[in-house]
Amino acid sequence: MRVLIRPNFLSNLIRYCSRGTHSHDRSLRSVLSSNMIRLYTTGMEPQLSPDLIKIMDQRLSAIEHRNAVLQKLINQPEYSPEEFSRANKELRKLRDSMLLINDLRAKQKEIDGLKSLVSESSDDKDMLDLAVGELDEAVEEEKRLQTLLLKSLLPKDEADERDCILEVRAGTGGEEASLFAMDIFRMYERYSQKKGWKFDIVDITESDMKGYKEASAAICGASVYGKLKFESGIHRVQRIPITEKSGRIHTSAISVAILPQADEVDVQLRNEDLRIDTYRSGGSGGQHANTTNSAVRIIHLPTGMMVSIQDERSQHMNRAKALKVLCARLYEIERLRIQSSRSKLRSDQIGSGDRSGRIRTYNFPQGRVTDHRVGITHHAIEDMMQGENLDMFIDALLLRQEMDAIASFSSTS
């Protein structure tokens, strides 16, 4: 297996890292540039620049101060139950960061002590060697804690933790595109199996040659959307189609969309959002007609939706029915809103389905797969189609996202 870092990746990364309006931004981006390239090729964690550590320390001090304020507030007897609950909720959010901060502060105190020991042991070689060794280990642990804290401070996308919907569609290239769509769909199925994810086929529309015009699946597992979201876009294939008599290489394209699965919609009706009127039913007469206000009309004020029920003799039963109908209608509105949002996301992700705007090229004659966003080429295409080595591209793209977040972290501080 060979992995190549293409020159355009290096130049694009340098241009990216040269952006920024402040000198410390440019310095940070320069550090990120060299570390990002090194991390792609070695899998090592990026080193933290002095500028970044200084910015992070300011954030950590603010967290420590806020934690101290909240701890003091919840111990005050005049604190109301509502304020106590809010403070406790915020403290829970700070808990993991505070554990890391406390570990970091303890390690930094240990480092200060070891530095003093080193300076005092210059005449005792054995003691000096022992102190230097412990100091080196402590410094490495400090770096590890700083890296963990930095990652904990970066903004997180709530959707990353969700399951996802995979949609694959044949684009430019006719039957060959549909055959490649089938290959890619099966690649993700094999990859999901290797990751231990649940892969449930939702729908498949076949072409005349049993390729896939469209195919979709629900993929469930830990942080599935966060791992697969970078697969969205145009995937291009270059190979000799099985229908090609003269052996010419054809270029086709398919689109892949990765959508976060929405949580089941819960319709919560607040009393202040409802206007409930009762009136006499307009039945055909008889003992209960027009004698009691059993009919119920409910208006949902935020939407103006109205439901009237007078089928039952009991006002209580009519009210329950009306609420059930109202909930069903509001649920449908929300479901359609989510569907519309997904459609927009899908459109943004896959574009027109032609070969422009491609994110990855699969060149079968040369046995290579190239991701154009990070300039990485992998020379083992058959393994790739079996669901192997996809993590190489995913991890590189996750790293790029992390570096973007770090750069944003510094520029907004």
Curated annotation (Swiss-Prot):
Which domain of life does the protein's organism represent?
Eukaryota
Q: Where is the transit peptide?
A: 1-40
| Annotated source species | Arabidopsis thaliana
Its PTM note reads: Methylation increases the termination efficiency of RF1.
Residues bearing N5-methylglutamine? Q287
- What name has this protein been given in UniProt? Peptide chain release factor 1, mitochondrial
Q: Which InterPro entries match?
A: PCRF, Pep_chain_release_fac_I, Pep_chain_release_fac_I_sf, Prokaryotic/Mito_RF, RF-1
Give the CC-aspect GO terms: mitochondrion
Q: What is its main location?
A: mitochondrion
Under the GO molecular function aspect, what terms does this record hold? translation release factor activity, codon specific
The protein's UniProt keywords, in alphabetical order, are:
Methylation, Mitochondrion, Protein biosynthesis, Transit peptide
Query: What family does the entry list?
Result: Belongs to the prokaryotic/mitochondrial release factor family.
